[in-house]
């Protein structure tokens, strides 16, 4: 079958062995790649009810048929496992250039199982698997680790994926980084690697994916670049990146702030995209094969962090620290972003937990010097979390156990154990549905449904028939994650273009109905994984605070409206009203 190596590699770090197996045409047609492939492999290999930190929990790296192709937005890889944060299905994606190196090792998927008794770093190539001692790397931050390995590995342009001290200490929202600042950020992938004593995985090789129409792919990519290089979407991402959302959400009243008690901040000009342009000298930074260049390489120009350089901050980091924690200087947000990157922490979970800790301190539940707009106090807490010191040890296990231990479930904001992104569902009702039913917990990326609600495609307050558009967006995003192509190209790659990309890479002809069937099958697979791990329909719901408390302007999301949205979603998915699958 074109577009695949038709091979998966399983690495067992317990006995330092590896095994290659064939992937059949029928198997690949059923799941395609990326999310479809990673999810199916998890279903097939993971024992039901396995502890996420057990050696038997598999960590899957999956690629798609678009990987290492000329298609714009195709340099991405996915990671899949049972999350230590939620205890459920876990997926995360990253860009950069690592996916190309992974593909050239000659496999469609890499499965890691077992656990080492001492730190290791893995080298995976088209020549085999090599297990290297990593005692000298253990304790290094993510940047230090990648720098050492770039000097140590002789191969040209290796893909280097690393964890930081947070992953080593199994902080349940630890990240996996590559290419300096590209991140598989959510649901604790880094903690799973850390539990297996794996500090890094390095990929390289020289194999090329056999596409159905290699010349056609080049022509297609050239055509799309000419058509869209000056498009409004391209210019918006290139000029402002995701921080453009700060002003948009703040104006809409849906910018979560002061730990979900407000929908806007007063001095937004201190933390928006304009503040980055004025004070951080941003330069566009793109993943390989991408013309959007949504990333921004910044350098702080003045103040105590003068000279600090990083790629970011993204909108979600600004929301987490600038909104929830009320940090009102972009330079301080850059500082906290850099600290999280170095330690290997998810910035979204970190900001949510820091703001939760502020509220816990104000309520007398914890003894900790921390308050809003105090970046040094927030930084000190993040370091405690990584080291699992004092209250940091409690917060390192996530918002759900922390809120239960402190008796603060009524104010804790999460779905299935994962904290939401920066779109308040009391303003954007479709995002309420997104958070409620997303397979990995409160996630905005499974549908990116903030886009139609903010752009006027559909009224944010509409309930009737909203689920139909929602499912359409979710299906298309699922296919992006299955190919794998960056979902920021959603405005440039409509349904027919997805079919065109599949035809050029795999040779398979798929009409819209075929694509919808594939997307639904992948969605059902993730649902099946969650159901067997104990998911109930009551888990497809929003936290008490978002349902019981209105924003200061009076806007709220009613429980009956959320019930209607979820029920409509179940029906359109063909699920039972209990959230179970028909089969």
Show where each model-derived region lies:
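Intrinsically disordered, low-complexity segments enriched in small residues
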Residues: 1-93, 97-583
């Amino acid at each position: 079958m074109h577009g695949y190596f038709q091979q998966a590699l399983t690495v067992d770090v317990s006995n330092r062995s590896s095994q290659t197996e064939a992937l059949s045409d029928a198997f690949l047609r059923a799941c395609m790649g990326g999310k479809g492939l990673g999810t199916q492999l998890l279903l097939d290999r993971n024992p039901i009810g396995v502890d996420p930190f057990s050696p038997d929990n598999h960590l899957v790296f999956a690629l798609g048929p678009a990987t290492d192709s000329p298609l714009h937005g195709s340099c991405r890889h996915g990671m899949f496992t049972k999350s230590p944060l939620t205890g459920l299905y876990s997926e995360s994606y990253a860009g950069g250039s690592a996916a190309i190196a992974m593909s050239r090792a000659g496999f469609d998927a890499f499965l890691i199982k077992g656990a080492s008794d001492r730190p290791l770093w893995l080298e995976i190539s088209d020549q085999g698997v090599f297990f290297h001692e990593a005692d000298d790397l253990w304790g290094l931050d993510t940047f230090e680790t990648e720098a050492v390995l770039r000097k140590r590995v002789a191969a040209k342009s290796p893909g280097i994926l690393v964890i930081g001290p947070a992953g080593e200490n199994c902080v349940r929202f630890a990240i996996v980084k590559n290419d300096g600042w590209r991140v598989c950020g959510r649901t604790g992938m880094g903690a799973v690697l850390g539990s297996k004593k794996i500090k890094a995985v390095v990929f390289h090789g020289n194999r090329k994916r056999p596409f159905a129409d290699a010349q056609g792919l080049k022509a297609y990519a050239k055509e799309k670049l000419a058509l869209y290089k000056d498009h409004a979407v391209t210019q918006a991402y290139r000029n402002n990146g995701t921080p453009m959302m700060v002003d948009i959400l703040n104006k809409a009243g849906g910018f979560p702030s002061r730990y979900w008690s407000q929908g806007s901040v007063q001095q937004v000009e201190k933390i928006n995209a304009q503040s980055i342009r004025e004070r951080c000298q941003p330069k566009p930074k793109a993943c390989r094969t991408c013309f959007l260049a949504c990333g921004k390489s910044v350098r702080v120009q003045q103040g105590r962090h003068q000279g600090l350089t990083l790629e970011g901050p993204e909108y979600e980091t600004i929301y987490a620290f600038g909104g929830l924690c009320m940090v009102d200087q972009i330079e301080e947000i850059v500082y906290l972003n850099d600290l999280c990157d170095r330690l290997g922490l998810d910035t979204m979970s970190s900001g949510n937990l820091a703001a939760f800790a502020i509220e816990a301190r104000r309520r007398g539940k914890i003894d900790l010097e921390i308050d809003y707009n105090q970046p040094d106090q927030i930084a000190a807490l993040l370091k405690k979390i990584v080291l699992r010191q004092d209250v940091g040890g409690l917060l390192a296990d996530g918002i759900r156990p922390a809120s239960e231990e402190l008796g603060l479930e009524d104010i804790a904001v999460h779905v299935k154990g994962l904290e939401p992104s920066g779109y308040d569902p009391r303003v954007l009702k479709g995002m309420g549905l997104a958070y409620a039913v997303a397979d990995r917990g409160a996630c905005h990326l499974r549908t990116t449904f903030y886009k139609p609600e903010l752009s006027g495609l559909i009224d944010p307050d509409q309930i009737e028939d909203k689920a139909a558009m929602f499912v359409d967006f979710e299906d298309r995003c699922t296919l992006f994650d299955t190919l794998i192509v960056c979902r920021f190209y959603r405005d440039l790659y409509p349904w027919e273009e997805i079919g065109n990309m599949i035809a050029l890479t795999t040779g398979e002809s798929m009409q819209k109905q075929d694509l919808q069937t594939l997307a639904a099958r992948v969605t059902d697979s993730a649902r099946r994984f969650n159901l067997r791990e104990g998911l109930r329909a009551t888990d497809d719901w929003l936290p008490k605070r978002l349902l019981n408390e209105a924003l200061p302007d009076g806007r709220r999301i009613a429980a009956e409206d959320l019930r209607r949205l979820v029920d409509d979603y179940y029906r359109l998915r063909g699920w039972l009203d209990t959230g179970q699958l028909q089969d």
